[in-house]
Amino acid sequence: MSKKALLMILDGWGLGDHGKDDVIFNTATPYWDYLMETYPHSQLQASGENVGLPDGQMGNSEVGHLNIGAGRVVYQDLVKINLSCRDNSILKNPEIVSAFSYAKENGKNVHFMGLTSDGGVHSSLDHLFKLCDIAKEYNIENTFVHCFMDGRDTDPKSGKGFIEQLEAHCAKSAGKVASIIGRYYAMDRDKRWERVKEAYDLLVNGIGKKATDMVQAMQESYDEGVTDEFIKPIVNAGVDGTIKEGDVVIFFNYRNDRAKELTVVLTQQDMPEAGMHTIPGLQYYCMTPYDASFKGVHILFDKENVVNTLGEYLAANGKKQLHIAETEKYAHVTFFFNGGRETPYDNEDRILVPSPKVATYDLKPEMSAYEVKDKLVAAINENKYDFIVVNYANGDMVGHTGIYEAIEKAVVAVDACVKDTIEAAKAQGYEAIIIADHGNADHALNEDGTPNTAHSLNPVPCVYVTENKEAKVADGRLADVAPTILHILDMVQPAEMTGCNLIK
């Protein structure tokens, strides 16, 4: 008899501290209690670097399902770059090697430009400092930093401090602050080319207020009532840091939307009517892919294509699969679970159950869970699927309302649906793995007793429903779920999946 597996994702169903805030623990869940007493279970980490997010950041449904389906940790750009700086693998990055080797061999200037703040939305000071260190290592004669000031993701007068930090770092590393301008000009995203031209003229033609002390120049701008975001162009009078033919430019913003327009006028398209022309022979490096249509630019950290996800691998091996959820979590069990792919694979069926039309889900805490369960049980009884993934949305969607009584009702509904689903699956010879993508209903109150509507940092359960009395399940993270499913199906794990089978 061929093996079959059911993966049940209870959205927002974390393992709480059993205090008053832990609605799941404090609500009567007879079937969940039976599962915990009867079957092997463990804990999975579902937040921070365990799911490819910055350390200490709570997990979310998109990232959770991506990691679950991928069978590996899928790192966000910021985390990928952070890790590369931390373990020094950035030094072996072929584009980094090409940029600095070219500058060294041809005696060219190196320019770093980007948002100079610790806001963490578009860029990171740590990345800029690391680039300065690499320039020092390559012994580059002229390294210039062009600072775009923030004031949106940071306090409006914090920029002066960032320039002080940068100058202190450059003093022991490499680089000089060549120019300063507000992000209002350098990082427009609405085709206001007259703003972009202010930045272009500063970078290429050295047009701006001349200053010998860049920190003092920032203070003077504040004194005139002009804060970081709107700082008018400032030029360091002590250096010629303009961008010239054949120079190396590294734009260190990792978010693409506000890095595109300046890149366009420097590298992609002449705008004679606005007095802007691309610069010949520029060796231009973007931190991440800014736009698929850009030609002739280098990319330091390219987008990862997540290949051989669980869905793709099952399809390639001729297995039949079903993905089912209500509207609120349908994209999660399809698009995100399949690594960012919209189209179903061969032999992949999908069932979408409409979520209830209510203003907020505390008005209908059971949501469409019973309808999902009925359709799912019917599909299980057809006995044609090798693999089924289902998401019950209530713990998360009702958890976000912060209304305790509603969350209790949501938990009761999920418990009832889990029972009917698992009993049907057992009767048809399925083994099941029950997990969550992140916590929420397990932490419904803040310490002061006010409602907490956010996700939790708690680990999530992993229950293995099996007839095998000897089985044990190890602790792990969400990336270990797909390899565990493949183990149940007696399939070899593909090389791209770096997670571990948790069944011992």
Curated annotation (Swiss-Prot):
The keyword Manganese applies. It holds the Pfam family iPGM_N. Its EC number is 5.4.2.12. Mn(2+) 1 binds at D396, H400, H455. InterPro entries: Alkaline_phosphatase_core_sf, BPG-indep_PGM_N, Metalloenzyme, PGAM_B_sf, Pgm_bpd_ind. One of its GO terms (cellular component) is cytosol. Binds 2 manganese ions per subunit. It catalyses: (2R)-2-phosphoglycerate = (2R)-3-phosphoglycerate. Substrate binds at H122, R152, D153, R183, R189, R255, N256, D257, R258, K329. Pathway: Carbohydrate degradation; glycolysis; pyruvate from D-glyceraldehyde 3-phosphate: step 3/5. It is an enzyme of class 5 (isomerase). Belongs to the BPG-independent phosphoglycerate mutase family. Monomer. This is 2,3-bisphosphoglycerate-independent phosphoglycerate mutase. The lineage of its organism: Bacteria, Pseudomonadati, Bacteroidota, Bacteroidia, Bacteroidales. The gene is gpmI.
